Amino acid sequence: AIVRQLVALGYTVNGWSRSAHAVDGMAMFTGPAAFDDFLAVTDVLICVLPLTDATRGILGRRTFGGLPRGAAIVNCGRGEHLVANDLLGALDSGQLRGAVLDVFAQEPLPADDPLWRAPGVVVTPHMATMASSAVVAEQVAHNVRRLVAGEPLAHVVDMGRGY
């Protein structure tokens, strides 16, 4: 949904994934070896990754340093992706110009957290996606129909991958 909306607005969209797959309208970078190349051409990094041992802390000094100077980040994935002190340092140095943060390691974000006062940071109340009850009901009904038909369920968590 994010890709479709950005492409419709005329943006060039690049994506990075652990494994190869195609997404219409998006140039894909695949695997750990392509991560630095992906970062180098990313002006606004939108993180929607699942939380795994490999992605915990991914929004930190190394990632920020790989982005073009003056880039921005949006985190609507998981709060544990972000290393807050690294973000504050990247903002102070000008490496990043801003951040929109919708998720936090501790929610609600404590009133005295420096992210509230950091220049260039927009804090939102974990609302990047608000699924309507009708959408949720349809997803459940879809899986019930699949179960009754003896088909594999959709959106099953792979415990080996962690998502």
Regions found by a protein language model. Give the residues of each.
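Conserved beta-strand segments of alpha/beta enzyme cores
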Residues: 12, 27, 97-98, 120-122
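Rossmann-like adenosine-cofactor binding region
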Residues: 19-114
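Internal, well-ordered alpha-helical segments in soluble enzyme and binding-protein domains
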Residues: 1-2, 12
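Short alpha-helical functional segments enriched in proximate histidine and acidic residues
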Residues: 5, 9, 41, 143, ...
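C-terminal helix-to-coil terminal segments
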Residues: 22, 107-163
